[in-house]
Amino acid sequence: MFKYTIKNLLLLLLLSSSFTACSNDDDKDGITNLGISLNVNGNEVSGNEENFFLQIETNGNWNASVADSWCLLSKISGTGNASVIGTVAPNPGEKERSTVITVTVGDKEETLILKQRAQGSTPTFENAGRIEIPKLKGGAMNLAYSHYTTYKNKKTITFSAEYDCTKKHTRWIAFTFYNETSVKNTSRTDAWADDPLIPVAYRTYKDDYNKAGYTRGHLCASEDRVYSKEANKQTFYYSNMSPQIGNQFNGGIWLNMEAKVQSWGKEDSLRDTLYVVKGGTIDDDKILKYVGSGVAVPKYYFMAVLARKNDQYKAMAFFVEHKAYSSYNITDYAISVDELEKRTGIDFFHNLPENIEAKVEETFDKNQWPGL
């Protein structure tokens, strides 16, 4: 028999109790409802022993079962909303395996397929090989995903991200500027919304920021995605927010760094494509504190920028402490990508050929970047 991993179990128990406490009252019309979901991206877990949540939303008596013995549920029956802890045993085989989870309430039945990768395999993320995507941290609690819209009859990435569920904060977001995505066709939408790709238990909300005295600071800025109204709306997902100090950071130095990168995104002489990565530091030793429902407040913020023009590359980065600034010059916070990697522990632009990556990341010449 396999056991729950202690660290994840404690976290899951805490979140389970908070979810159960939010159970809805019985439906006043006497109609029994049933909905189920898993807290893992794509209903897929790693090949190691791992815990997950089965989230059950119902106003009736439910029963749950799993088709295979390598997956166990901590509870198989109950009444009303519940978050059930599931555990999978290691998968030492060479192939992915799957099992069916079934929940019934009266004559209603819902099923989910849970997939488990083979040990040693990497998470499935369709855009992991793109130039702007950093090396993934991976693991079941780090969700890598992309948001898309249809723009000019073409599927277009708004931004990609890796979201840390334990910190309730994005590790990084990444996107590109090129001719079609650097134009302005719309204005700020203020379409604040939950990110549908983040499990409910790990989402953040307005009070997580405002009640703690922070603003909702965009990582992918609203002004970064003004080529399309639908793309701009996606920048207002709460997964794209970070708790930032107000006018003297979010509305000051950070805003000015964003504006500078946006100007480069429009600069035809600088780029065919501009690859941008932004984020706040959320490793344990680089967090100021936690606020609200457990949202990490980064101690530092960063941007990594790579310009490609006629198959020639150059790169630079910004790294800035999260504090109030009364005066500043953003040039003072410009560094090489190599230096940013040392400070953040993130491997940027690793999908470039090694010789190109090494050359562009070790050098930074501010004279190559207009207005810096």
Model-flagged regions — what are they?
Residues A89, T104-K108:
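Beta-strand-rich extracellular modules
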